[in-house]
Amino acid sequence: MILKNISLLIILFFSISTFSAGHSLKNISITVVAPATGADNKTLSDLKNINGLNLQISSKCFAKGKLPFLASSDEVRFNCLRDALFDESDNIVWSLRGGYGSARIIPDLLKLSKPNKEKFFIGYSDITALHLFLSQEWGWKTIHGSNIADLLKPEQDQGNFTKLAEILKGKVKQVTIDNLVPLNDIAKSSDLVNGKLTGGNLTMVQTSIGTSWQIKTKGKILFLEDVNVVPFRLDRELLHLKQAGLLEDVKAIIFGSFGKDLDATMLVLRNFADSLDIPVFKTNRFGHEKINDPIIYNTNSKIIKSKEFKLVMGV
């Protein structure tokens, strides 16, 4: 009886959370794309059945190809993304989930001319590759934020979607990331840092090095996050960015979550921060954990200090 009641409470919590997020996105037409890993039919059906959501999900974009970890073949994923980006009837393109595969279709994206209409493009994790392309090649202000399938995850803070909805509906002129903790002395003594934002998932940022879509960091505020990263791997990837010269002209670095923030992970981040002559901060307000506040690429932003440090972005 107790187990049954617990199960009912879990189902009720999930239903309320999903309804709340769905309500904040009510009447917003959203084109869902799967440029990386896909989802099973139940996941797609559950998304379509969330009350108030207006999701455009094309079944042809989920025809499995040879590789089971991709939503479909490279050709199909590219075509579906291209069609969504160029369709002038919708304003929002939202990635289903991350996983793997976005980098595989960038060579074809590079052959395209920039569309006449700029759209909201949302996603994170593996989708970082597309953020770098769209912000650097087309000059778009894309949004690093929860993938649409995260609506079905009860462990996710549904406030992530409320904040995204406020941006999409034009209700806010700026968004903020609070609780920036300075990791080195330069950060502690900083009062103001100005710059546009770039970055995203550390693994994907590292993957971009040496490619046609390599991250451009000069004069930018760099934000980085990842998931389940063991300390030595984290140190190795950060060292790669440094030795590749990508941190030489960075205005500041903001680290998001990297898992459970074990003591060893924080030791790596603090040690790395001390090796740099730029401000470095840490927050748990974005990444693969419960809270994933939106961050806007390519927009005028600033790190300011009042009672605490915070990142303020224009919309």
From Swiss-Prot:
<dbReference type="GO" id="GO:0004180">
    <property type="term" value="F:carboxypeptidase activity"/>
</dbReference>
<dbReference type="InterPro" id="IPR003507">
    <property type="entry name" value="S66_fam"/>
</dbReference>
<protein>
    <recommendedName>
        <fullName>Putative carboxypeptidase RC0549</fullName>
        <ecNumber>3.4.16.-</ecNumber>
    </recommendedName>
</protein>
<dbReference type="InterPro" id="IPR027478">
    <property type="entry name" value="LdcA_N"/>
</dbReference>
<dbReference type="Pfam" id="PF17676">
    <property type="entry name" value="Peptidase_S66C"/>
</dbReference>
<feature type="active site" description="Nucleophile">
    <location>
        <position position="125"/>
    </location>
</feature>
<feature type="active site" description="Charge relay system">
    <location>
        <position position="288"/>
    </location>
</feature>
<dbReference type="GO" id="GO:0006508">
    <property type="term" value="P:proteolysis"/>
</dbReference>
<feature type="active site" description="Charge relay system">
    <location>
        <position position="225"/>
    </location>
</feature>
<dbReference type="InterPro" id="IPR040449">
    <property type="entry name" value="Peptidase_S66_N"/>
</dbReference>
<keyword id="KW-0720">Serine protease</keyword>
<keyword id="KW-0378">Hydrolase</keyword>
<dbReference type="InterPro" id="IPR027461">
    <property type="entry name" value="Carboxypeptidase_A_C_sf"/>
</dbReference>
<dbReference type="InterPro" id="IPR029062">
    <property type="entry name" value="Class_I_gatase-like"/>
</dbReference>
<comment type="similarity">
    <text>Belongs to the peptidase S66 family.</text>
</comment>
<dbReference type="GO" id="GO:0008236">
    <property type="term" value="F:serine-type peptidase activity"/>
</dbReference>
<keyword id="KW-0121">Carboxypeptidase</keyword>
<keyword id="KW-0645">Protease</keyword>
<dbReference type="InterPro" id="IPR040921">
    <property type="entry name" value="Peptidase_S66C"/>
</dbReference>
<dbReference type="Pfam" id="PF02016">
    <property type="entry name" value="Peptidase_S66"/>
</dbReference>
